[in-house]
Amino acid sequence: MIKTEKLSMLFTTEEVQTKALNEVTLHVEQGEFVAIMGPSGCGKSTLLNILGTLDSPTSGSYFFEGKQVDKMNENQLTALRKNNLGFIFQSFNLIDELTVYENVELPLVYMGIKTAQRKEKVNKVLEKVNLLHRANHYPQQLSGGQQQRVA
C-alpha cells in the first residue's frame, strides 16, 4: 500500500521558487493499477521520484506498507528500494558490455542470491517477457521494445 499526505516538493534557486508538487494526497492499495498523467511540467516525474525514494519531499508524509518512508535513513531507504521497488526509466540504462542475461542477473548478484537460484529467476523472467531466446544477445542487438522489456 502506498499513501501520501499533503506531499509537496519545492525547488528553489536564487531567481525563482518552483512548487513541483502541491500537497498531493494519494492512496494506492496493493494490486491496484494507477496511471499518473498530465501535461509536461506538472510534477509527474517529481512524484514518481519521491515514491521511488530517489528524492525526498519538502513537506508532507509518505507511507509504504504502513512504514513512514520520509522519516527513513539512507540504509532503510536502500533496503526498501532493494526489496520492494523496481524502476523502468524512459532511457533503458542497460549495460552495453553485458548480455541480456547478465543485465537481468546483475541486481540478483548484488542481492547475494546463489548462482543456481539466479539462473532460475533470470530464465523465468526472460521467458515471461518472451526474450529467453535473446539471453546471449547484447542490448545493441535488440529492438527498442526488446530493450525496454529487458530493463
Residue ranges and their predicted role:
Residues 1-151:
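ABC family nucleotide-binding domain
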